[in-house]
Amino acid sequence: MNTSPGTVGSDPVILATAGYDHTVRFWQAHSGICTRTVQHQDSQVNALEVTPDRSMIAAAGYQHIRMYDLNSNNPNPIISYDGVNKNIASVGFHEDGRWMYTGGEDCTARIWDLRSRNLQCQRIFQVNAPINCVCLHPNQAELIVGDQSGAIHIWDLKTDHNEQLIPEPEVSITSAHIDPDASYMAAVNSTGNCYVWNLTGGIGDEVTQLIPKTKIPAHTRYALQCRFSPDSTLLATCSADQTCKIWRTSNFSLMTELSIKSGNPGESSRGWMWGCAFSGDSQYIVTASSDNLARLWCVETGEIKREYGGHQKAVVCLAFNDSVLG
């Protein structure tokens, strides 16, 4: 892989943050130093994801997708696409980088061919409500789509069939995730509840079956994201209640609560905890919040190890990749 020394792509750890100040910032994770800032002029950034080969980062915003080069300091996007209506809320990649998926407020999830330099939309999955989240099953053959009507759709990419679940009617699904072992699926919603299912099937031609496992009253306010750890032992949930909570998947008990609440009774709210990402060894987690900061926490102790300051407005999304390619 051709990475120039001193570029983001040459660093074994890629940490990027973005949000409402129209910039994407790249950080040296261990020092907290901002190493590169990309101006993302057209809109806020709703979602960020690094390509599997660590060569590019996708930034999804209002009516567009921009992809920036990680192996050079080129300030301009190397791939741009503007043909989607409304906000794009979610973005991710097939594990070998052949295609990208997105979901957004135009009520569609889309698959994009990445093998040519101009993004080609290959397939569209239409639902009846704006889409908040899309995640890919580890089998790379099913997309989980969560929408604002409270539905979770399982779109089988091989057969084009889809199944639908509605844990709470008319309560918006804000995030869904499947753990790397494909043992569990979690989804959080706008009332703060987290639902967990056991997964079976999903191998070969078998369709994934979801068996309800538990409902966690995770937060008292809007939940914004849920993420399993790479070792599948933990589940993190982020919320408008200023916390990120970490749950053990062995029994879904609370292990650690990470809070940005002020100890000062007179101080107003520091805002929402928008998103999170675990480190590859599952020992650390980075959070993004609307007090303009990202933070690196020790999962076990809940201690803040580093703060990443520089954004002028809320940080609502991040990408964290510390897996070194062999």
Swiss-Prot record:
Cross-link (Glycyl lysine isopeptide (Lys-Gly) (interchain with G-Cter in SUMO1)): 313
Listed Gene3D superfamilies: YVTN repeat-like/Quinoprotein amine dehydrogenase (2.130.10.10)
Modification sites for N-acetylmethionine: 1
Subcellular location: Lysosome membrane; Cytoplasm
Coiled-coil regions listed: none
BP GO terms, sorted: cellular response to hypoxia; cellular response to nutrient levels; cellular response to osmotic stress; cytoskeleton organization; DNA damage response; negative regulation of apoptotic process; negative regulation of autophagy; positive regulation of actin filament polymerization
Cellular component aspect of the GO annotation: cytoplasm; cytosol; lysosomal membrane; nucleoplasm; serine/threonine protein kinase complex; TORC1 complex; TORC2 complex
UniProt keywords, alphabetically: Acetylation, Cytoplasm, Isopeptide bond, Lysosome, Membrane, Phosphoprotein, Repeat, Ubl conjugation, WD repeat
Entry-linked Pfam families: WD40 (PF00400)
Subunit structure: Part of the mechanistic target of rapamycin complex 1 (mTORC1) which contains MTOR, MLST8 and RPTOR. mTORC1 associates with AKT1S1/PRAS40, which inhibits its activity. mTORC1 binds to and is inhibited by FKBP12-rapamycin. Within mTORC1, interacts directly with MTOR and RPTOR. Component of the mechanistic target of rapamycin complex 2 (mTORC2), consisting in two heterotretramers composed of MTOR, MLST8, RICTOR and MAPKAP1/SIN1. Contrary to mTORC1, mTORC2 does not bind to and is not sensitive to FKBP12-rapamycin. mTORC1 and mTORC2 associate with DEPTOR, which regulates their activity.
The protein's name: Target of rapamycin complex subunit LST8
Species this chain originates from: Homo sapiens
Lineage of origin: Eukaryota, Metazoa, Chordata, Craniata, Vertebrata
Name of the gene this protein is made from: MLST8
